[in-house]
Swiss-Prot record:
The gene is pqn-96. Signal peptide: none annotated. Residues 1-19, 33-76, 148-194 have a biased composition (Low complexity). This is Prion-like-(Q/N-rich) domain-bearing protein 96. Residues 1-206 are annotated as: Disordered. Residues 126-142 have a biased composition (Polar residues). It comes from Caenorhabditis elegans. It comes from the Eukaryota.
């Protein structure tokens, strides 16, 4: 790959070099600056091609290096592993040391024993399924209707308090248009077009 490009460079540069004396004396100064400019872009192009070649070969060689251990890594350990499973055990090792326990003869007894052992002890004072279904409402310390967060009747009171708090904040705003600043009620009316508070401001102001 390296030899092909210099062979192309030599015939390419040879006709350009004798072209200087062949051309007339008047055309020589005009062609002379053009040829070095023409040669300069050619040189980096060939150099880039030369640099690309070893890079490609390096990548190929690296790929070969990476591929070779990948191919060797699975092949080398797999064969002794397969052979070790197939080979007989030494005399010191008992034949059934690693066999799983046979679950067929004791299949009916062991799961019941395990379930009985894992079950938590039950208090005799507890009767029925406490905490499941409808019986959980009766065992509520807060009562069947009440919730630990409070009675549901407090929610409408909270919603009623909110407009009152808005009115308290809007009362100092009512004093502003009385002093002649008429832009503030217009701005608040634009910000809250659907609320009834700006209408209340006008009634209070009147």
């Amino acid at each position: 790959m390296y030899q092909s490009y210099p062979q192309q460079q030599q015939p390419g540069y040879q006709p350009q070099q004798p072209s200087h004396p062949i051309v007339g004396a008047g055309a020589a100064p005009t062609m002379a600056p053009q040829n070095p400019y023409g040669q300069q872009p050619f040189q980096p192009q060939f150099q880039q091609g030369q640099y690309q070649q070893p890079s490609g070969q390096q990548y190929q060689s690296m790929q070969q290096q990476f591929q070779s251990p990948q191919q060797q890594a699975p092949t080398q350990p797999t064969h002794p592993d397969r052979e070790s499973y197939q080979t007989a055990l030494p005399a010191n090792v008992t034949p059934g040391w690693n066999d799983p326990p046979s679950m067929l003869p004791s299949a009916g007894t062991t799961p019941n024993r395990l379930s009985n052992m894992r079950r938590r002890p039950v208090d005799p004072s507890i009767s029925g399924n406490v905490g499941y279904g409808t019986s959980s409402q009766t065992s509520n310390p807060y009562g069947a209707s009440a919730s630990p967060y409070g009675a549901p009747q407090q929610n409408p009171q909270q919603y009623q308090e909110q407009p009152q708090s808005y009115q308290t904040y809007q009362q100092p705003q009512q004093q502003q248009p009385q002093y002649g600043q008429q832009q503030n009620p217009q701005q608040f009316g634009q910000q809250y077009p659907g609320a009834g508070a700006p209408h209340q401001q006008q009634h209070y102001g009147m």
